[in-house]
Amino acid sequence: MLNVLIVGASGYSGAELVNYINRHMFSKIKKIFVSENSSHIGKLFSELHQEFKNIIDLPFEAINYDTLIEKDIDAVFLATDHHVSYSLVPFFLSLNCVVFDLSGAYRVKNTDTYLKYYGFSHQHQDILKRSVYGLAEWNKQEIKKAELIAVPGCYATCIQLALKPLIKENFLNDEFIPIINAISGVSGAGRKANITNSFCEVSLHPYNVFTHRHTPEIIEHLGIPVIFIPHLGSFSRGILASITCKLKCNFTFQDIYNLYNTVYKEKPLIRVYEKNFPSIKAVVKLPFCDIGFIIQDKYIVIIAAEDNLLKGAAAQAIQCFNIRFGFSEIESII
């Protein structure tokens, strides 16, 4: 039985992690943490997330280095802002814990990215070099040996899963930059209240065009340039991405369908559509990334959908956890 800490357990993704680990056959939650200024300190998890009453009644504890030092901790999940994870990762690695970081603090190797997109200078370059990018379907062998797994961003996950097979097999015309329009529910902005994600204020609008933090992440890990246009939608959870590309040759629908099926046939959390398109309704509260597409002449439009809190965050983190410790990839997820 593996002992697990979860930091940032009051947030949306953190709560999903608590749920997954609680029902995991081979792991046990030792403690759950929130920030030192949180109003939830001392409250039960089930007070904040009432659906877990009499199921998960653990108390929230404040983050500080004294309480974080626990004996016999095997793994730590950080569902925290990047500046918190940035500081905590070295600490937990020094305690020989395997760390699963859901923030953007260690996802990208190019240190210039952190100054430009995150506003800080990355000083833990030795750790950054050792971090493994946790795109579970593509980096399984690296994840098996990693001590720090940087769980990909929500947008970055579904976009890469949709594009990587085409890039790997050199199906795309290099002269045409993929154009990505993706819509996320407001839970992607976190749990803290602000005017941006207020129900009465959100309609459907683009944001952070050319400046979104997932842009350099997508570009670095795909290895090609893209134009990424994120949108905020007036729904709670889920991401739908529409990706327009140009193919190198006159590939048929069956050619592309066979490619996706070949690449993902052993990947239980990827569902490839032969008919119709994915929808947010089909993936909300489920751990899947659904992929569909249509071709006209040499153009292909790929539609990818996922739950941003699950396959885009907690479910993928648990998937990486399972891979790292040799469990079934879908243990506690399905």
Curated annotation (Swiss-Prot):
Q: Which GO terms describe its molecular function?
A: N-acetyl-gamma-glutamyl-phosphate reductase activity; NAD binding; NADP+ binding
InterPro entries referenced in this protein's UniProt entry, alphabetically: AGPR_AS (IPR023013), AGPR_type-1 (IPR000706), NAD(P)-bd_dom_sf (IPR036291), NAGSA_dehydrogenase (IPR050085), Semialdehyde_DH_NAD-bd (IPR000534)
Q: Which reaction does it catalyse?
A: N-acetyl-L-glutamate 5-semialdehyde + phosphate + NADP(+) = N-acetyl-L-glutamyl 5-phosphate + NADPH + H(+)
**Major enzyme class:** oxidoreductase
Give EC number(s), comma-separated.
1.2.1.38
Which parts of the chain are coiled coil?
none
Major location (coarse): cytoplasm
| Alphabetical GO biological process terms | L-arginine biosynthetic process
- Family statement: Belongs to the NAGSA dehydrogenase family. Type 1 subfamily.
Name of the featured protein: N-acetyl-gamma-glutamyl-phosphate reductase
Q: Which organism is it from?
A: Buchnera aphidicola subsp. Schizaphis graminum (strain Sg)
What gene name is given for the protein in this entry?
A: argC
